[in-house]
Amino acid sequence: MNFFVYLLKAYPMGNQMRHLFASWVILLVPVLGFSQSTASTAVKPAAGDVAAQAYHEPYRPAFHFSPKEKWMNDPNGMVRYDGVYHLFFQYYPNDIVWGPMHWGHATSKDLVHWQQQPIALYPDNLGYIFSGSAVLDTTNTSGLGQPGNPPLVAIFTHHDPEGEKRHTNDYQNQSLAYSLDKGATWTKYSGNPVLKNPGITDFRDPNVSWFAKGKKWIMTLATKDRISFYSSPDLKSWTKESEFGEGIGAHGGVWECPDLFSFTRKEGDKEKTYWILLVSNNPGGPNGGSGTQYFIGDWDGHTFKTQDKTTRWIDYGPDDYAGVLWNNAGRRRIFLGWMSNWDYATTVPTSTWRNAMTVPRNVFLQDANGKVYLASKPSPEVLSLARRKLRLRHVDVDSSADLSNQLKDDGGKYILDIKGAADQSVAFVFYNAAGERMVFGYNNVKQEYYIDRSASGRTDFHPGFGGIYTAPRISKDPVLNLEFVLDRSSLEVFADGGLTVMTGVFFSQQPLTKLKVNTTDRWTIKELDYAAMASIW
C-alpha cells in the first residue's frame, strides 16, 4: 500500500498543495533512512534501549506476531524452506508510521514462535520495496542458484518516489532478489526491474507460483482495480496472459495483494480442482475501509474465469487485510493477514510498535447451501500454546450468565469453542472490571453476526473505530458453532466451522479477563471448550 497516495486520495487538495506535499515527501527521504545500496545490510540498532519493555507494553499481543518495534503492514514473501517458515513484511524501521518501505523478516519452525531477523531488503535507487512474494526455485529456472543449492527468489514491487513526485504513471515496477543461504541474506538481481510498468498507476504486489501443468511461473499482479496474469519460464522474462475483474467483485477502491492457488478434491468418482483468487481492496471492505475478497473459479494457465458473481469475503471483520498464503507448505494452505485497517492503522494508540498479524489459519473448501465456500480456522499449531484447558457441558443461560469464575483470570488470552442452538439471538461479552467490553453477537432475526467495540476502551483515535460491524451467517445449521481467539488487543471469531470469520482489534486499558453470555430467552450452551494461552515472547 502506498500510504502517501492513500493520503492524497483521502484528503483532496489543490495542485499547488499536492506539489508541496510531494516535495515534502521527497525531501524527507534521506532523513527517514532511504538507502541507495542494492544489497542487504545488517539491521541498524534503534536509538534508546527498548529491550526491557519489548513485547510487554500496553496492548502488545501475547501470541500474534508483531515487530519488536516500529511500523509493520502487509505480510510478504511467505515461504517455507528446509523446515523453516519465513515471514517477510512491509516494514519501516525508523518510526511507528508508514515510511519508505523495507522488507522486515521473521522466521519460525512452528508458525507460532517467531524470531525477528535482520532486515531482508532495503530501499535503493529504484525505489521503496513494496509488497511481493517469494518462491523456492527448485530446478534453478532463474539461473540464480548453484549446483545443489536452489535459490529462494523474492519478487517485489519497486516504488519510485521520484516518479510519483513527477506524477508519471509508471513508477511501480517488478523486481527480483535472491538468497543462496536459506533466506538469511539477499542480493538484488542486477537486471532489475524484470517487469516494467506499461503505464498503469497502480501496478504492484506480484504473487508468483509454479504452474506445473504448464511448466511455467505465473505472476498474479494487482493493476488498479483489476488482476493481470503474467507467465515466465525463468522468473526474469514475463509475458502477459490475461486480465480479470471487470464488472465483478467489489470495486470500492484499488485492488492489492492478490494470491492464486488451488484445491483438488474427490466429488463422486472424479477429482475436481477449484482455483481460488484472493484480492484485497482498499477502501471498499465489507464494513468500510480495507478488506479481502475471494473468487472461486477455473484457471487454465492463461485465464481465470468464474461463474459466481457474488462478492465473498475471507473475513468480514474490520481488521484482516492483505492476507496471502505460504508458498512451499506442502498440501496445506496456510493464510496470514495484516490485523489492521487503513482507516486507522497509523493512529492506533500503541507506542513502540504498530500493528500485528492474524494467527496463521488453515484455509479449505466448505460446502453450504449447495455452494462451495472458502473457509478458515486457526492452524493446529496455535493450540500448542494452550497451558490450561477446561470443558463444560450443558450450561443453562437464563437471559444472562457470567462464566468468569469458571474460566478464571488468564490475562485475557484464550481460545474458546462454544456450541448452542441457533434458534435465538445471543451475545458474548468479553469485559473487564472497568466496564470495557468487546461484544460478539448473533442476531437470529437478521441471520447475521456482529462485533460491537463501541465500549472496548480507546476509540478516540478515529471517528469510525468504535462501531458495530456485521457479517452474514452463511450456514443454515440449527447449531451455532463458534470459535473465539482472544488476545490482549484482538478478537478473531470463526463461526460455523470457519464459513463466517470476523477479526477486530481493540484497545482496552486492562485485559478483558471476564466473560458473560446474554440471550433473549433461556439458552443452553451445549459444549464449551476453553484453552488458556501462553505468550510466545
Regions found by a protein language model. Name each.
Residues 1-42:
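Bacterial Sec-dependent N-terminal signal peptides
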Residues 36-206, 210-256, 264-315, 339-393, ...:
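Beta-rich carbohydrate-recognition and catalytic domains
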Residues 6, 36, 132, 414-418:
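Generic low-polarity alpha-helical segments
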Residues 270, 298-537:
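Beta-rich accessory regions
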Residues 6, 11, 21, 94, ...:
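Compositionally biased, low-complexity linear motifs
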Residues 12, 31, 46, 75, ...:
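Intrinsically disordered, low-complexity segments enriched in small/polar residues
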